Amino acid sequence: MSSACLYASRQFHIIVVLAANIGITEHQMTDTTIPIARGLTRWQASGIHLLISAAIAAGALFITLRVWYPPPLFTAEGGSELLFILVAVDVVIGPLITLVIFKSGKPGLRFDLSVIALFQACALVYGCHVMFVARPVFIVLAMDQFETVRANDLDAADLAQAPDPAFRSLPLTGPVFVAVELPKDMKQLREIIAETQKSGKIVTHLPRYYVSYAQHKTKAVTQSRALDPAMKRGGDFATLAQKFLAESGRKASDLNYIELQTRRGFGAVLIDAKSGEIVTLLPPKL
């Protein structure tokens, strides 16, 4: 999260950039006798503000899309709604306020611009935080279905009980594929059912039952369905799958699929029909 939120601090350089256009140094700006941004029109000031805001938002968006929510998880996990709010506040409203209040040589202009920059920085930091804590951290195979598990779905106490040290902390660079492996003893299974009913937690949110997907690939093939028959039935799923096949050069007969439950509905995970290797994710119908 820190990488994205560092962009927020750059909002405070708006004033410095405006002043630099008229030859005022950052040190000189501490002298209240020097009017800020003399000679700039409000349209120029708003345009500079817009460019800076757009650059900062683009940096935060890049990290969000490439690291925390790799395609197609951004739309599947509802990230687009928050993005709209962030863009509205950080890229649109800030420069509009500058357009309204800016007047070259206006007393108190430096303070006004500082307040706008602070407001935008706070909005960006808050948005980054929300996106960070709601990011998908594991894609869990349980029985014949994958499910996205978000950072705020897991308790620290439950993470600490994971048998594999790799699953005792939340991934920072995108979701990790894992599988749920339950004991075969019926008594233990009944105890797990009783525990989940009492705690209200589902098994996919209990990392102590996680194993690496690599250990589960062969079994995943037996739990999957052939892609070719599904393609022949048509529909949105077939359209998305056909698009992937055309772009990748893969054959439908070489692939199987397993349903993927996301916040916005059911998508699919395509796997190699022989090895069980993950090939790609198909988004749900939105």
Segments predicted by a language model, with ranges:
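Membrane-anchoring/interfacial helices and their immediately flanking loops
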Residues: 17-20, 24-69
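Transmembrane alpha-helices and immediately adjacent membrane-cytoplasm interface residues
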Residues: 94-105, 115-142, 148
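Lipid-exposed faces of alpha-helical membrane segments in multi-pass integral membrane proteins
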Residues: 48-60, 89-93, 115, 119-125
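Membrane-embedded alpha-helical segments of integral membrane proteins
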Residues: 55-101
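Short extracytoplasmic/periplasmic juxtamembrane "stem" segments immediately C-terminal to an N-terminal membrane anchor
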Residues: 83, 140-156
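Membrane-helix interfacial "entry" motifs
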Residues: 33-46, 71-83, 104-109, 113
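Extracytosolic and intramembrane catalytic regions of membrane-associated proteins
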Residues: 158-286
